[in-house]
């Protein structure tokens, strides 16, 4: 899941009154053979530990590879590889007629850590209970991986011939670690994954309120993730002889300045359309404020009022926040070292290095050193100049297909292009010039988002509706009915 992403909730408050629909149907339109296949793939993936600490993405990749070989895919259309033997990625090319450029589907196989003592069930056992599937990865994102595998196998079994190649990449280390699979493939095997555009089931999806579909979100852009290490060093000394030059005080002062700093207000094409749409659904002062921020000259007072909502604030601004702190080495000694981590979510169009330089200006203290920390935990004096590109125009073919499917499966729920305030593997494909969209048919209650958390779970019928959705979507985008 996009790092730090909050599934749903961004549009829910305004839509509840206007777009409530009948509860979800009891069963998705998926035959029993497909249900069994999807169940078995999902169970197999959940029960393969793919955490960074002790797990193996390679084991999951090989399990998928074997299923695809058994379904009749040629080994010549597969690639298994990566930077080390635990982090091998799998790429499959489902060959079409070549009438159109390929579509790339990406799904990460790794999951965040989970401790057995924190859960009521074993996080690495696939448990069915009370209408839910439990297990680490049921929401993030082995559900999406299982759906992609199921879709590929069923299409192959039916002899389906798409009008374009369908490329699917199952990858490592979206959640962290040193070997991000999408980044590695872009840098080392771009020819295997080059496509017109990218669909990432790790974003988007249907927001539910008490079983009723509120909206179908499509992640049309996202923020850039960046960690920065703040360091202050000092000779230290005995605590009975304090001096003003204290490493902790310098660091604390810098963090207080960050606390009171607001990055500039910015809207892009996606967020402008989002807030403009939202203004027609809200009422009173909130509606007026939403209209005011989408004008050619946005109203500063309206921006300030709307920024009190953390989700809207994050969509309007780059945000940086202190997330970790450590200092000192003894209770009776002046600190020789004070460190903090500042986590930033950066609006499209700005680079990691640009924000590092901005932090230096905010802190305004030469004793505070600001370094960039990559996903592997490695620290660098300078950050990459990589930036999340401004969102391209929405793909009309894709949006039309999603609109039609949503109208049929969740009548009345609007399709809402959004900006994810987190970051996913789409950041790498977007940067490589392949427009990337978070698209999912999974429906989750807005108050039951458990990705990365305790007792992660997914409603059983939501999973099978997701299977149904992607099977139909792939056909619609590749020449099928």
Language-model features: locations:
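N-terminal secretory signal peptides that target proteins for export/translocation
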Residues: 1-7
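Bacterial N-terminal signal peptides
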Residues: 9-23
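Metal-dependent amide/peptide-bond hydrolase catalytic core
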Residues: 29, 204-465, 471, 477-481
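Acidic/His- and Gly-rich active-site-bordering loop/insert found
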Residues: 29-136, 155-164, 342
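Solvent-exposed, acidic/flexible segments
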Residues: 31-39, 50-61, 85, 138-141, ...
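Sec-exported extracytoplasmic/periplasmic mature domains
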Residues: 43-50, 65-74, 150-157, 187-194, ...
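Solvent-exposed loop/turn segments at secondary-structure junctions
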Residues: 51-53, 85, 96-99, 109-113, ...
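Acidic/histidine-rich catalytic neighborhood of metal-dependent amide-processing enzymes
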Residues: 132-133, 139-217
